[in-house]
Design a protein with these regions (language model features):
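Residue-identity detector for glutamine
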Residues: 11-12, 18, 23, 28, ...
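Context-gated lysine
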Residues: 5, 15, 26-27, 66, ...
Length: 289
């Protein structure tokens, strides 16, 4: 992996460089400590919260992190990560391109699952913001509530592909298909593509997708499918597909949404509370707490 954090309790994620590591750890233990007679650099995996060791900090232009499970007496000062071999097995940095299904579940009492759920509640307005940005579609209060209820029913926080970095997009991935008619789109290019493929539709003055002939039925629905994750060298990338399909399950339009891990983490670590929508946070708490 090419990123690290310094404890389970933080969501501040940093690129692995000597300068960044020194800046956030101030060269203190347990992040700096000897192992096997040599200097060691230790941190926490941002995805699974297990300890990691930084490899090649001084010898390589691009040092990287590797999961590390210390044997008794291997380190003098206990490391900050939470040792959990089961989380490690499904960590995107460990399993790399391992195929996931929604049925792959964490244990009900998983500490990481609890943290994912808690973060979703506390940051729900920012989750909705990023989903609207990625889809070009407004998510109404009513739709947000439906999505929360389906996330609760699916226990989405237990999905093996969920991490604290990808909360907005995995939240959407748990949603069942929803009807398209009446949804407000603000992405003109995507909307024009949809209308070209379905000339029976229109984009009304309110920005809503509607049907030209009120006597006819709009059979289109939208969903989020195909969660994919890939590690190239040491860098993780993830995506899902925003899919619009007809009643024959034929795709009419689709868009790949690449997970913006850095943007999400920047938002949740921001001290600026001015533009937050607390009514959405309260909604999430009422459904999930």
């Amino acid at each position: 992996m090419d990123v690290f954090k310094i404890s389970v309790d933080t969501q501040q994620v940093h690129k692995i460089t000597q300068e960044n590591f020194d800046q956030v750890t101030k060269k203190q233990a347990p992040w700096y400590q000897p192992i096997n007679g040599h200097q060691g650099w230790f941190a926490v995996c941002p995805a699974c919260d297990n300890p990691i060791q930084i490899i090649g900090m001084l010898e390589r232009d691009a040092p990287y992190g590797k999961h590390f499970f210390p044997t008794a007496g291997a380190v003098l000062v206990p490391l900050k990560g939470r040792v959990d071999k089961e989380e490690y097995e499904w960590c995107p940095y460990a399993s790399k391109n391992k195929h996931l299904t929604k049925d792959d579940r964490r244990a009900a009492g998983s500490e990481l699952a609890v943290l994912i759920k808690q973060t979703l509640i506390e940051q729900f307005d920012r989750v909705i913001y990023l989903l609207e940005k990625g889809t070009g579609m407004r998510i109404s209060f009513a739709l947000a509530k439906q999505m929360l209820e389906e996330y609760r029913a699916a226990e989405g926080w237990r999905y093996r592909g969920a991490t604290r970095q990808n909360i907005p997009w995995v939240f959407a991935y748990m949603m069942q298909a929803k009807r398209l008619r009446g949804r407000i789109f603000f992405d003109a290019k995507f909307t024009e593509e949809l209308l070209t493929r379905r000339p029976d539709l229109t984009w009304n003055a309110n920005g809503q997708i509607d049907i030209k002939d009120d006597k006819k039925f709009c059979d289109l629905s939208f969903s989020f499918i195909r969660h994919r994750r890939h590690v190239d060298q040491y860098t993780l990338s993830e995506s899902i597909e925003f899919n619009i399909a007809n009643s024959k399950q034929e795709t009419v339009c689709k868009r790949e949404i690449v997970f913006e891990h850095d943007h999400f983490l920047k938002l949740i670590n921001s001290k600026n509370e001015a533009n937050r929508k607390i009514n959405l946070v309260e909604l999430a708490r009422s459904v999930l707490a």
